[in-house]
Amino acid sequence: MAKREKLLKPRQAIAKMDPYRPPSSGRGGKMRLDFNENTEGCSPRALQRLKGLGGDTLAVYPEYEEALPQLARHFRVAPNQLTLTNGTDEAIQLVVNTFVNPGDRVLIPRPTYAMYRFYAQVMGAEIVEVDYRKDLSFPLKELMSQINSRARAVFIANPNNPTGSSASPAQLRFLLRAAPRAAVLVDEAYFEFSGQTALPWMDTYPNLFVSRTFSKAYGLAGLRVGCLFSNETNIAAIRKGQSPYSVNVAAVAAALEAVKDRAFIRRYVGEVRRARAMLCTELTRLGWKYFPSDANFILVDFGPHARRMRDALGEREILVRDRSYELPGCVRITVGAEAQTRKLVSVLRSATKGVAR
C-alpha cells in the first residue's frame, strides 16, 4: 500500500483561528432585521443602471479612472485620498496588510465588528481587546493604557456595532494623538444615521484612516463596495498592496448612481431615524432596557428572556441577531422602515405578554 502523503499544514495563525460562520441562508422572504441592511432595497437609479449594463461592459476588467474623481467629489476629498474597496472588509484587510507585521500589537474594543479581529489574526498580530464599559460607552482610558511601542493599528467602529454607541470627536482626536505610530481606522459604516465623521481631519492626523460602505444606508450589501480614505501618502502605500480589480464593474456603476440619488438616502435615513425613536418609545413602554443608538439598530437587553423573545419574533418571520454570546441577554434589532417597525412593535407587545417578569 502506498504510503499516505502528509497533509499540508496551514500557518500557525490560521490553525489557531476559530472559523467565522455568519448566517448566510434562509433569510429570503422574511423581515431581515438581523444584519443592519437597508430593509427597502437600493436606489431605483442604481437598480436601473445595473439593468442597463451590457455584455460589452461585463466582458472587460473594471476601470476606476472616472469613478474615483466622482466619488471624491461626493465625499469632499481628493481622488488620491481614497481607494475603492470590496466592502469594508477589504478596507480592514488593506490596513492590516500594509501596516501590521506578525507580532505587532492591534487594539480592538470589545464587542465590535468581528472582521477587525479576523484580519489581525490572519496576520498573526498580538490582539489586545478592550471591553466597552458597563454602560457600553467608549473605553478611551482603557484603550490608552494598552498603547505601547508595538501598537501598529487601532480599529474603532463609530458608531459601534453591536452597541450603537459612539466615541466623541474629542475622544477620537485624543486617541489619534496618543498613538502616532499606529494606523487608526475609524469605521463609519453607519455614518449616514449618525452624521458624525472624522473625514475632515485627514490632513491633521497622518495616522488616520476612515472607511465607508455602500452596504447599509445605500442598500448595496450584495455588491460589496466601499471606500477607504486617508492622506495621499497612506493611500499610495495601500494601493501598492491592493488587487487592481477587487471591486467589480456592477458595484462601481451602482455606487456612482447611488451617490447621485441624494433624495433617496435622505428619505430612507429620515424614516429610519423616526422608526428608531418609535421603537425606543415602545421598548420603554414595555419595560425592556435598551442602549441608546446612533446607528440603524437598537441593542435590547431582554435578560433571561432573550432566546424566547428572539424565537417569538422568528416565528413571525422577523429575523433579529442574538448577541448573548458576548453581551448576555442582549439582542440586536435592525431598524427598518416605519411600517416594518410597526409590525415589529406589534409582535414585541404580544411576546412580552407571554413573558413572566
Task: Please give the residue ranges for each predicted region.
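Conserved PLP-binding catalytic core of the aspartate aminotransferase-like
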Residues: 272-273, 277, 282-316
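Short acidic capping loops at alpha-helix termini that bridge into adjacent secondary structure
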Residues: 78-82, 102-105, 150, 188, ...
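PLP-dependent aminotransferase class I/II
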Residues: 207-291
